[in-house]
């Protein structure tokens, strides 16, 4: 089948993890601004597509996207195409997304395999339990998608490039062998400075 539940449980040790995850301070996190221009491959999270398409990606992210090898996930494709068909801008947004997807080389678009799906389920369950969020608000599904992207990147030896700071910080705490590169969009940076 390709998924070894016993090995995944041995590796993640969900039964031994207690308490609540806490986001690390910014100085302890890997930021796009601190990354060398030339480096290892990137695995793009959905936040990257949204920020680039809306013109709000920071310069450091744009530079990394220009010079680094970029891989893509079918999980993000799924997230990008969940739109309300009745919304006035949906047709235009879908055209933009379609053009973006057409630019992705087929050999750089990856689908999670059975092992990654199984591991992601265990990891997402652990993340949900340790994040202490309320049930029934969609967090579990979001965590499965984040875990899929994180584990796919790890499998490829790539770093996840993402603006989803909290969730990917948590994932990298739970699986320290996965790599992440974080950023804040300029709008998010302004909100932090004023708040």
For the regions a language model picked out, list residue spans one by one:
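Alpha-helix capping/helix-boundary segments
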Residues: 48-49, 76, 116, 149, ...
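Generic detector of contiguous secondary-structure segments
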Residues: 61, 96-118
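Short, well-structured N-terminal submotif of metal-dependent ribonuclease cores
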Residues: 1-99
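Active-site neighborhoods of divalent-metal-dependent phosphate/nucleic-acid chemistry enzymes
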Residues: 2-6, 26-28, 109-159, 163
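Short, hinge-like loop/turn segments at secondary-structure boundaries
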Residues: 87-91, 127-128, 178-180
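Acidic, PIN/NYN-like endoribonuclease modules and their adjacent C-terminal/linker elements
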Residues: 1-35, 150, 154-195
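Phosphate- and divalent-cation-binding pockets in alpha/beta enzyme and binding domains
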Residues: 79, 119, 170-171
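Short active-site oxyanion
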Residues: 39-40, 68-69, 106-108, 154-159
